[in-house]
Amino acid sequence: MESSSSGTTSSTIQTSSGSEESLMEQRKRKRMLSNRESARRSRMKKQKLLDDLTAQVNHLKKENTEIVTSVSITTQHYLTVEAENSVLRAQLDELNHRLQSLNDIIEFLDSSNNNNNNNMGMCSNPLVGLECDDFFVNQMNMSYIMNQPLMASSDALMY
């Protein structure tokens, strides 16, 4: 009987070792499936991140292009305004010079008028009176001087 009990024990051991191997094999397959699923989820996350970053890059490139265009337009406007401003400065200088010249003429006429009034008494108002023979005193000649056009060109601009 001894032999029969040892035979059942060995078959039980073989069966239990077979079931352990089967159980280990199942666990191994389960781990493999779990690892595959985890790797698939990881790849999906990476792909989503890559897609998001690509979309962000495209958006930033578009925004950068818009900013560069805006800066270019603003620079052109600035240069145009700067050129116009330079012309206006030149015209201002010319007008100031002409005003100073006219003030000098008026001052000269006033002093000349005072001398003439003291000496001859002929001209009472140098800007209105036609009785004076002086070229600068004659109103027709004064209108000629005052109606000269202003000349300013962008070529002669000084900053």
UniProtKB/Swiss-Prot annotation:
Region Leucine-zipper: start-end pairs: 53-67
Positions of region (Disordered): 1-47
UniProt feature, compositional bias: Low complexity: 1-21
Taxonomic superkingdom: Eukaryota
Major location category of this protein: nucleus
Induction: By light. Induced by hypoosmolarity. Repressed by sucrose (at protein level).
InterPro entries attached to this UniProt entry: bZIP, bZIP_plant_GBF1, bZIP_sf
Free-text tissue specificity from the UniProt record: Highly expressed in stems and flowers. Expressed in root tips, cotyledons, leaf vasculature, embryos, apical parts of siliques and funiculi.
Cell compartments where the protein resides: Nucleus
Domain bZIP stretches: 25-88
Entry keywords, A to Z: DNA-binding, Nucleus, Stress response, Transcription, Transcription regulation
Gene3D superfamilies for the chain: 1.20.5.170
One of the record's GO molecular function terms: DNA-binding transcription factor activity
Family annotation (SUPFAM superfamilies): Leucine zipper domain
Residues covered by region (Basic motif): 27-48
An annotated GO cellular component: nucleus
UniProt-listed GO biological process terms: negative regulation of translation; positive regulation of DNA-templated transcription; response to sucrose; sucrose induced translational repression
Quaternary state and interactors: Forms heterodimers with BZIP1, BZIP9, BZIP10, BZIP25 and BZIP63. Interacts with ADA2B.
Functional description taken from the UniProt entry: Transcription factor that binds to the DNA sequence 5'-ACTCAT-3' in target gene promoters. Promotes POX1/PRODH1 expression in response to hypoosmolarity stress. Positively regulates the expression of ASN1 and POX2/PRODH2 genes, which are involved in amino acid metabolism. Regulates several metabolic pathways such as myo-inositol, raffinose and trehalose. Regulates several trehalose metabolism genes, including TRE1, TPP5 and TPP6. Mediates recruitment of the histone acetylation machinery to activate auxin-induced transcription.
More about this protein: A highly conserved upstream open reading frame (uORF) coding for 42 amino acids is essential for the BZIP11 sucrose-induced repression of translation (SIRT). Plants over-expressing BZIP11 show severe alterations of plant growth and development, reduced seed set and viability.
Protein name: bZIP transcription factor 11
Organism per entry: Arabidopsis thaliana
Gene: BZIP11
